[in-house]
Amino acid sequence: MRKIGISDIEDIALGAALLGAGGGGDPYIGKLLAIGAVKECGEVSLIDVDELSDDDVVVPVASVGAPTILTEKGVGSNEFTKLIDMVGSYYGKKITAIMPIEAGGVNSMLPIAAAARLGLPMVDVDGMGRAFPEIQMVTFTIGGVSASPMLFIDEKGNMGLMETINNKWVENICRAGCTACGGSVVSTEYVMTASQVREFGVRGIVTRSQELGRAIRGIKNCPENMTPEEYFFDYTGGFRLFKGKIADVLREKTLDRKSGSAGMPRPI
């Protein structure tokens, strides 16, 4: 176990933005929420899943919808409290820990804010190691874990619970509900035991995000005998696939998501 403070949040947000490759949107608003929660409620305990008992209940917390809309609406502490209370009432069990569902954008930050507000630890694991666009696109689906019952809440206090026939239908119905709620909701899905998280989760993703963020911040201080690119690859164990120049970026926003594309004439 270790503590996550404000400087750690800065690095995690930066590294998660890299891992997300644009998925999950800009982590900026989520970073502000996480920093605000830590300032008010104290640092968050980051734990490994092996520190939990097999039957402990772990709850992912995420935002569904367009991150740019979340920037306008924000997320208050009441949403986290009501959501987790509803999960506990439904399952009749005490919630042991929070976890992120993806690495990237806002959803790398909201679990930190939730854990701080709720006084719960956060598990160093997620369901993809990146940021994919749909709810069913996680390792937990591959492992046969159900995303439902999914629970969600908007900033007005509207709450919903759905049970579906498969994880793709969670995505379909949630998007419709998200649109009706103004374009973004806070949700929890894939409520699992620690045993399931241990078997199917992508472990160490928060730590990895922090390491990448630290490498990016320190890239200007690389040794004289290395280029910034060489330093970053050496630090992270990465490698270059190709090199090119971005010539065009197109961003599109709908009520339930934001998408985009980047154009590169040809690799260099």
Report the location of each language-model feature.
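Short glycine/serine/threonine-rich phosphate/pyrophosphate-binding segments
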Residues: D26-K31, F80-T81, I101-A113, G129-E134
